[in-house]
Amino acid sequence: MSRHLNVAIVGATGAVGETFLTVLEERNFPIKSLYPLASSRSVGKTVTFRDQELDVLDLAEFDFSKVDLALFSAGGAVSKEYAPKAVAAGCVVVDNTSCFRYEDDIPLVVPGSESSSNRDYTKRGIIANPNCSTIQMVVALKPIYDAVGISRINVATYQSVSGTGKKAISELVAQVGDLLNGRPANVQVYPQQIAFNALPHIDQFEDNGYTREEMKMVWETRKIMEDDSIMVNPTAVRVPVIYGHSEAVHLELKKPLTADDARALLAKAPGVTVVDNLSKASYPTAIKNAVGHDDVFVGRIRQDISHPCGLNLWIVADNIRKGAATNAVQIAEILQREFLLKLSLPQ
């Protein structure tokens, strides 16, 4: 019989936190008691889990010794302050922020796509959930990488506003309403108007001209694959879509791979659905395929006419589910099933 765990959700009132609750319930995760946590501003609110209304508790006052596992998605500053406290109290943390992703002794995990040595969850009691855009790309590319190797990845992302949070969703909806009614758009969340627009600017700009979001895809892909030789060249774009991230990916492979062989590899890959029938204009989109689902959807699979070892893909996923909450819960399932009973955490 599986062990039922006491679980805390840090950031339970946010977009990802709410989806944590949904995914835990859908996947019937074995929970004894669940504690929704947020800042003091959210105390007094309730969340629904398994037909029960649960009071949101103040994170600052919570005793993490009550729980076995904590899922964090409340921003990097919150994770930096409270994740070590949770571990010190004997709790294991799955963190959805970028706070710990680049530390050598903290695993960065996409279940099924990470190397075997990146599955040592016991080093510091913290497991990092990768960036949403990295997750969906790595899930789709891992079968190809295993088969023929990958030398270079060129990727352009088309990322929905839900990746920024609830305020960004509200701003997009408000801007559309204002503009359609002849009023100027009120710009607060993004540096420029997002409605009817595309912004090649996600996170801060780095000294090399790339954004932090783009560099996340470089660092994280290499860490997950444990292959620093992979060259990754991203351009991250925010688009006026509420849910679902899309990516145009162009690969330089170490050996040639036909489009048919790539489809066959991907069709067998866990967590991947191929949608690629051009005669029926069938290719994946955020609205039709990704939103509300946990798979990564791949289409427009074709050999690159400009390179003998080139392959092009279109990759779509729900950024709040597989790109965040579902991936974290899948990590939690591995912990619960394989590791949690034998963790030896630092004191």
Swiss-Prot record:
Keyword Oxidoreductase assigned: yes
Binding site for phosphate: R101, K216
Pathway: Amino-acid biosynthesis; L-lysine biosynthesis via DAP pathway; (S)-tetrahydrodipicolinate from L-aspartate: step 2/4; Amino-acid biosynthesis; L-methionine biosynthesis via de novo pathway; L-homoserine from L-aspartate: step 2/3; Amino-acid biosynthesis; L-threonine biosynthesis; L-threonine from L-aspartate: step 2/5
Active site: C132, H245
Documented EC number(s): 1.2.1.11
BP terms from Gene Ontology: 'de novo' L-methionine biosynthetic process; diaminopimelate biosynthetic process; isoleucine biosynthetic process; lysine biosynthetic process via diaminopimelate; threonine biosynthetic process
Binding site for NADP(+): T13, G14, A15, V16, R41, S42, S162, G163, N319
A GO MF term: aspartate-semialdehyde dehydrogenase activity
Entry-linked Pfam families: Semialdhyde_dh, Semialdhyde_dhC
Reactions it catalyzes: L-aspartate 4-semialdehyde + phosphate + NADP(+) = 4-phospho-L-aspartate + NADPH + H(+)
Annotated binding of substrate, by residue: Q159, R238
Cross-referenced InterPro entries: Asp_semialdehyde_DH (IPR012080), Asp_semialdehyde_DH_beta (IPR005986), NAD(P)-bd_dom_sf (IPR036291), Semialdehyde_DH_NAD-bd (IPR000534), Semialdhyde_DH_dimer_dom (IPR012280)
UniProtKB keywords: Amino-acid biosynthesis, Diaminopimelate biosynthesis, Lysine biosynthesis, Methionine biosynthesis, NADP, Oxidoreductase, Threonine biosynthesis
Role played: Catalyzes the NADPH-dependent formation of L-aspartate-semialdehyde (L-ASA) by the reductive dephosphorylation of L-aspartyl-4-phosphate.
Quaternary structure note: Homodimer.
Record family assignment: Belongs to the aspartate-semialdehyde dehydrogenase family.
Record protein name field: Aspartate-semialdehyde dehydrogenase
Source species taxonomy: Bacteria, Pseudomonadati, Pseudomonadota, Gammaproteobacteria, Legionellales
